[in-house]
Amino acid sequence: MQQDDSPKLFTERLVTERLFTDLETPELVEQAILRREGALSAEGALVIPPAPRGPCQRFIVDEPSTTDAIAWDEGNRPCTLEQFDALWDGVHGHLRQGERFVAHLHVGEDPEHYIPVKVTCETAWHCLFARHLLIPPARYNPSAKEQWKLLHAPTFDGAPPGEGLVIIHFARRKLVIAGQVAAGELHRALLAVQSFLLPEKGILPLEGIASIGDDGDVALFIGAPGSGRRTLAAGPGRSLVGATGLGWGRDGLFNLAGGCERPLLALPPRGAAPGFGTLVENGELDEGRRLDRSAAARCAFPVDQLGCERAGEPRHILLLCRDPAGVLPPVAILDGESAADHFLAGYGARAGLAEEGEGKPGARFAPGFGASWLPRSARVYADLLARRIEDGDSRVFVLNTGWIGGPAGNGGEPVPVEVSRAIVAAILQGALDGGEGTPLAELNLVLPRAVPGLDNRYLDPANGWRDPAAHRAAARALAEALGANLARFARGESPCAPARQRA
């Protein structure tokens, strides 16, 4: 029989192969369509239809390297080696029964502090998500580091019904994700790995974005999702670094991630629709294959267009807080210790609180401004922040990007973005570097006496309240809440309850 040596089309050779390694974006999109995992929108985005997404429980194997280092709580539950082995072996066997997609990626842009990871996925679209949110290197693992391995199996039936599991084994450098969970858990699990390892090297992992000016000055914007980080960091003549996670060490800032995951609703309504290569999870298409901008849809894409992988020491640090109480000023000055306290508190509006202030206002305290992938005690990261601020001689400010003049939904109005932009411009020009102002002792803040380009009536938050006494009462209540929250993180103590809940 004559052998057929003619070249095979990509789609033809897939018929005889079950393992696909390091496919590029177009190939993964093609595979996702062939496997009916999703469909293309009119603009070319890969749209994955809505599917059940259950709660995800993250476990970490309790072994010598983690026993006393992890802040054991509801977000980081301990499990045994036997439980990990059972899930790993089950998922490994499950994946070998069908086609699987492998990608060799890095977590972290830094040539010294990256970690290499082999990601094995059950679906093409999850592999595409991994390529977008992590870093496909030009050369994999050039320093020949010990490799991490991640298995991802959404249809594995060993997970609790309607839920998902993530288990991390630091000593073996392995992660396993099983069950119907949002794709973002893959990315967050690997950020948790870096966030455990980096502090041992004196590097602070954080959720933020940096901008670099034409003269090389660096500004770091830290805040919870929805606080306006990207909106305020972007500007004429400034390049961006980071979209999801950053590492801050002695040599400056570097990307931990290579892409961005955002709600579809967060994209400009009049901007270009997501195009080819963009992944839309929980998306729906109309008869014309146009995307429905639903609240559940999330898009993932690489951020090559940011143009920068690293930045030097930040000259200015801006902590962004969406204050639902309308108590905080639009801008205040912090020193390193007070900045660490505000970072520890992570005070802001609860997720989903409407910009218009509709509904009952609600606050939350999320250490690190809600970076759910920080597995150590929040005090570890706060102390690192204070050290980095001191070593870099950075100027620190807190900006209220929430409400002023009253609580959200009860007389308060959103801080105009024009006001926030004017404040950022003044900070970047160095107009507030002197640090002079009026102390607001109960909130551990200093009010600047003037901000160029900003009406002075905005500087004192009490000015916008109809009843000054109501503002004083609200400020006292916030100060007490901040104090009670910080009391959980006394220096040298773990912020978690001592009791451990096992898997």
Describe each model-derived feature in a short phrase:
Residues 2-44, 199, 207-224, 234-236, ...:
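Glycine-rich, often acidic-flanked micro-motifs
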Residues 102-107, 203-205, 398-401, 436-440, ...:
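Short coil/turn segments at secondary-structure boundaries
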Residues 228-229:
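Conserved glycine(s) of the Walker
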Residues 1-141:
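N-terminal accessory targeting/assembly segments
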Residues 145-197:
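Charged, amphipathic alpha-helical linker segments immediately N-terminal to NTP-binding catalytic cores
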Residues 73-80, 176-182, 372:
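Short histidine-centered catalytic/ligand-binding loop motif
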Residues 69-72, 169-175, 363-368:
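Gly-rich Lys/Arg/Thr-decorated short loops/hinges at beta-loop-alpha junctions or inter-strand turns
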Residues 458, 463-503:
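Generic C-terminus detector
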